Amino acid sequence: MDALTVHRLHFAFTVTFHYIFPQLTMGLALLILILMGTYLAEYRLRLEPASGAGRLVWWMHTAALLIFLPVIVRTKHLHLLLAPVTIFLSRGGFSRIPPLVGEEDFGLVTGSDSTRLVALQAFSCVECGRCQEHCPAYNTGKILNPKEIALGLRSYFKAHGAGSEEPLLGEYLSEEAIFQCTTCGACEYQCPVGIEHLPLLVGLRRGAVNTGQWEDAHGGELFLRLERNGNPLGMSALERDKFIKRAELPLYDGTQEYLLWLGCMGAYDPAGRESLLALTRVMRYLGVSWGVLKKEKCTGDAARRLGNDLVFQQLAEFNIGQLQAVRARKLISICPHCVRTIGEDWKQAGASFEIEHHSVFLARHDAKLPAPGTRERTVYHDPCYLGRYLETYDEPRAVVAGAAELIEVARRRERSFCCGAGGGLAFLGEEKGTRVSRERAVELAATEAGTVAAACPFCHTMLRDGLAAVRPLNAPQIVDIAQLAAARLPRTPGARNDDSK
């Protein structure tokens, strides 16, 4: 029997089942029913292979299996074959964005820019919907649906092929949708077949940004602020200098144990400064030596996640030069975004630094701090970049439990719900639909805790606004875990409390 005949028989079988059993999705459900039914019949009834019933069940099972194999490649059940390969070929680690290769690599612009892994992942999607169930954008009325990203790529490849020069964004994938992603990683964490949604989305963003297709006023202003001012807030570096002088922060000279990375929020944002100064009070109490960089710019996290690798590279190279000049050995930061970018993304810029989040430091030294006077009910919010990205869950909880009565929210740890700031979205203007921060604030307020503990300055800002909107008259106060730890310290005469201003 030649290949053409086999193809025709397969086509005839598929069409026949489509019209006879339309409710069974081209007969696949019936085939699966026969496969499982005959297997269970043989197992439960203990049929003798030589008996008539045994032979009938064997032939039915074998026929269903032989029919199922050629049909599977034309249906969504193809994932049964491709998913193990996808998992095996995944990049390893969580949401690792591949570097651009060469001057002509602009990201995912057309089908020809996609790799075999991208195509493989598109056809591996089970269509289970677990990614969309946990996506903060999808669950707050945005058009982004991570499942549809994979299915859109699949439709593109079916229509045009992987080597096509047709643009990816347009008929099958929405530009608006890909820029609604907070890069929280919930989709990637939940996917049972290992589809790496975030590298796909960032690749598509790269293509839109590098070709000039994405024309967003807020995004353009953000990139200009990063280039001109070195921070996404557009603040002058003189403000950082004034803060360092006013707060009497020592400069790092290579002899201290830690280089305290201020970050943009720690250097310029009032709430971020309060969190940073709380950490410095604890470090001073513990007798740990530290210093700060004289000059420091944004790590490039927002630029990287929004697809502007040029700005990211410029910022990374400047900061790497500053750190290498003072021979920095060990860094500490209050910002999980900074920790992830410095510890992971900067490796592609040729640098490797040891850096830890302040929750790890505080948890390690928790036993050395005085016991708290009172323990207020406090609910902890897991930041996406501290939890799913850095897999740090227990340490911040230990800090909270050491200072307060720890309360847990329903969606927590690996399944925590995003605050809405990641992926550069904190700087892209008003959201469509419900604000992600408001959705999370409703969950946190429902615990009836008097205090919300954060471990990320972006979460702190987003949730502060969200809680105020949800409960304008009696909103829970929000504090950083460093502030909880610092509150356990004895008050010293003449202590400075207004250095964040």
Q: Which positions does each model-derived feature cover?
A:
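Hydrophobic alpha-helical positions that pack around
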Residues: 380
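Cofactor-cradling patches in redox/metallo enzymes
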Residues: 262-357, 385-401, 405-501
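Iron-sulfur-cluster electron-transfer modules
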Residues: 113-116, 122, 148-150, 157-341, ...
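Polytopic transmembrane helical bundles with strong interfacial aromatic enrichment
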Residues: 1-39, 50
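Membrane-embedded alpha-helical bundles of multi-pass integral membrane proteins
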Residues: 37-109, 113-116
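Short, charged low-complexity linear segments at domain edges
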Residues: 90-117, 151-171, 393-402, 421-433
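Non-transmembrane accessory domains of multi-pass membrane transporters/channels
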Residues: 95-146, 183
